């Protein structure tokens, strides 16, 4: 335990890394933005518009996916935003909570894993420690080969358009449509709760949700190319978008973009008169609380990676073990994938 916490590869060490800390700051700013958009009426306005526009179950499911695709910056930010917006919309079309959870979760993570401007891109690229290739560059090159994420998104479209359900999901959907029971299980989260949090003052609009998200994405992209030397006249990537993007410091850039996006959201809602200063300050601790789970998951993942790499030297062991394997080493990726698939079935 002492080694995991205080060693050169322990929790303290990974949290002291500027890139990792940048991702954590980014997650906190996203949590604050979600709470601000809820308090400012952005979720309420978009849900109101969607309720008037969406007329069928298929359209409600596809809109859930589309909104999830548009909010690709972080999977938890995606889940919190899309869940708050689409819950009442899907409820009006008798779509079960289990189906809504599937639509949101099956969109959030895959989209983040194929979006270069996301917290996942920053985290995954950080695992690449090589002078031969940049982490972001490798992340971008693997996108066409990320079949799981791409096929998951295709699967959502097929299931929604063809109205196909099977297994436990079929039971949940049958109960929702025939028995008017959206939950099926004894746990009934959000039952009886107000659909949305109303803005403190004034009437909200769809822009109250879309504008902060668009600004966040834009400032994150600008921050990424800035950190890569796009605006530096002495850099070899001066005015080279692709080169600067590949050479960017993703953790620091996303933290900067998140802070600017959060600041814009606060000022925007102040000028709109949607929330007061006191209300906006309440979003700081509430937003942080919403992001505790992903922060802990990332921290433990970084620690495990550091421990296996520098404490157990697993990479060196695998390299030496495969040195004499000859052509059999080409099967190593398949063996790793098979191991990942079978581990969850072991009790």
Predicted regions: what is each one?
Residues 129-136, 232-242, 316-321:
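Membrane-interfacial helical/loop segments at transmembrane boundaries in membrane proteins
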Residues 122-130, 224-227, 231, 305-310:
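Juxtamembrane/transmembrane-helix interface segments of polytopic membrane transporters
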Residues 5-101, 272-347:
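Membrane-embedded alpha-helical segments and adjacent helix-loop junctions characteristic
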Residues 1-7, 23-32, 149-154, 208-218, ...:
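Hydrophobic mid-bilayer segments of alpha-helices in multi-pass membrane transport proteins
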Residues 143-150, 190-194, 200-213, 217-221, ...:
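Hydrophobic packing and interface segments
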Residues 12-21, 139-143, 240-257, 323-327:
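Interfacial loop-to-helix junctions that mark the boundaries of transmembrane helices
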Residues 91-181, 196-208:
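Membrane-core helix-loop-helix motifs of multi-pass transport proteins
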